[in-house]
Amino acid sequence: MRAVVQRIKEGKVTVEGEITGECNFGLLVYLGVGREDTVEDAKYLAEKIVNLRIFEDQEEKLNLSVKDVGGSLLVISQFTLFGDCRKGRRPSFSEAAKPDEADYLYQEFVRCCNDVGMTVGTGVFQAHMMVHAINDGPVTMLIDSKKTF
């Protein structure tokens, strides 16, 4: 499972002009599910992101988590995070999970975040979405449950 995590001042996602999720302060999480991913990957990534210390403390050190600062999450499904662009000019998505499995694990990730008390806004799985965000910092992290960057 792979995530691009951005610290944001605010964000929202719309589908066909309707707001489906929003976050007034916290993290925007683009979440991709790989074909080898399991519920354990969803649990690992949820725990990692909720406790990731990328907010500044009083000494301006990145020492606080989204949970510590009372923020929320905006989670957007994004299979393109598993796009492989190494060959040719068209990305291959063969490493992305099939839609049914990806949706299940996406929902499991959201549930894991909710279970630890996080407020989570979401997009609509497989929908064409418009994501609006005001980045803070910017602070952007790449996290993968199976490999390092």
Curated annotation (Swiss-Prot):
It is an enzyme of class 3 (hydrolase). Its EC number is 3.1.1.96. InterPro entries: Daa-tRNA_deacyls_DTD, DTD-like_sf. Homodimer. Belongs to the DTD family. A Gly-cisPro motif from one monomer fits into the active site of the other monomer to allow specific chiral rejection of L-amino acids. This is D-aminoacyl-tRNA deacylase. It comes from Alkaliphilus metalliredigens (strain QYMF).
